[in-house]
């Protein structure tokens, strides 16, 4: 049995990760509930595979019993984190995933004491959600230790995979969220907007507030009590987001949600190899003190899915090598703000 289990290895992102892990000699065990998909993938990659659903705890324990770490790539993570984390606690297996779901970060954080007692690391969010933003949050907070406010923004050039689109539908009625005085507060979606200079020719970019995972994680990484996260989008898109908030009760009805999930299954595939090769991502971070002192830093990196593969495998390799601080962790909390600089093509610069 390999030291690394990749669960949900045949989804869009899971496939990219499984392929890269195999190419780099990690020899992962591929796992999930769909036998036909696993058989085909395992034959192509030359890997072992295990068919196991998350509602089969005894089988799941057997799959994880000889593993050092599991990388959960099966979303929506609101449905998958709990049975997998429970299995990790029972089998003393380190847990990593690629979620960006704020509520999932909070829920896994609540298991931190149990994980520490079991000698297990719980490290959600090891993809684009939230490694680059978490690392930049840690960096600007390190530059300004007395900061009491963090603002983070990102710009991504990509389509989305089926799994990401389904997760968006799963949370369509969640609205927005910010952290104020250390507590997460619900707010209307896109309730704030501003312009940001992402650098590299992308100045004056319009961004709007969204409930990115860093609303949860940045506080645990830095201790800064006020956090707002933004995504680049045209002003027209912001207006549509705000208008959509008026119909979210309709969108959250089970028949409507089921219809949206079906439509995604029929129409969404994710960026192709050329798009992943050419695309770039940008992150901007600002830390501010109560008396107005501020610092600004930013970074540029590969396409979001390409970056996810790199950061997921970098953190998994650290765990496999024994560098796995126990309890709940964030990427930069576990491995420092320079973790992201280990990804080829990432540049970081301090602006203010």
Language model: regions and residue ranges:
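Rossmann-fold NAD(P)-binding glycine/threonine-rich loop
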Residues: 98-120
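C-terminal helical cap and adjacent loop that interface with cofactors, partners, or active-site loops
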Residues: 272-352
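N-terminal Rossmann-fold cofactor-binding loop
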Residues: 31-35, 53-54
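Active-site-lining helix/loop region of Rossmann-like oxidoreductase modules
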Residues: 7, 142-289, 293-296, 306
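Conserved beta-strand positions in the Rossmann-like core of class I SAM-dependent methyltransferases
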Residues: 5, 29-30, 96
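Rossmann-fold NAD(P) dinucleotide-binding segment
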Residues: 62-66, 78-97
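Conserved Rossmann-fold cofactor-binding substructure of NAD(P)-dependent oxidoreductases
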Residues: 51-67, 72-80
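N-terminal Rossmann NAD(P)H-binding glycine-rich loop of SDR-like oxidoreductase domains
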Residues: 4-24
């Amino acid at each position: 049995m390999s030291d690394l289990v990749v669960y949900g290895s045949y989804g869009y992102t899971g496939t990219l990760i499984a392929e890269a892990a195999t190419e780099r000699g990690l020899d992962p065990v591929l796992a999930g509930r769909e036998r036909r998909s696993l058989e085909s993938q395992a034959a192509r990659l030359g890997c072992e595979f295990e068919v196991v659903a998350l509602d089969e705890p005894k089988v799941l324990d057997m799959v994880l019993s000889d593993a050092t770490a599991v990388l959960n790539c099966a979303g929506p993570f609101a449905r998958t984190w709990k049975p997998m984390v429970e299995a990790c606690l029972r089998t003393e297996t380190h847990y990593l995933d690629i979620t960006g779901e704020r509520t999932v970060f909070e829920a896994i954080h609540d298991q931190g004491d149990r994980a520490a007692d079991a000698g297990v690391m719980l490290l959600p969010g090891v993809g684009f959600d939230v490694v680059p933003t978490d690392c930049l949050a840690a960096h600007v907070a390190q530059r300004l230790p007395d900061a009491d406010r963090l603002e983070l923004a990102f710009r991504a050039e990509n389509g989305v995979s089926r799994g990401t689109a389904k997760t968006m539908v799963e949370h369509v009625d969640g609205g927005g969220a910010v952290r104020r005085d250390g507590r997460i507060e619900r707010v209307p979606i896109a309730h704030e907007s501003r312009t940001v200079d992402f650098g590299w020719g992308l100045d004056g970019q319009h961004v709007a507030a969204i409930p990115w995972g860093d609303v949860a994680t940045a506080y645990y990484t830095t201790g800064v009590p006020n956090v707002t996260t933004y995504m680049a989008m045209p002003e027209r898109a912001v207006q549509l987001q705000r208008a959509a908030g008026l119909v979210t009760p309709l969108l959250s009805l089970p028949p409507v949600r089921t219809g949206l999930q079906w439509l995604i299954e029929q129409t969404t595939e994710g960026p192709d190899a050329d798009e992943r090769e050419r695309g770039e991502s940008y992150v901007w971070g600002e830390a501010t003190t109560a008396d107005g002192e501020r610092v600004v830093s930013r970074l540029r990196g590969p396409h979001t899915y390409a970056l996810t593969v790199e950061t997921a495998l970098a953190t998994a390799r650290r765990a496999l090598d024994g560098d796995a601080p126990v309890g709940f962790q964030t990427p930069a909390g576990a491995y420092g703000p320079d973790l992201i600089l280990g990804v080829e093509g990432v540049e970081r610069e301090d602006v203010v």
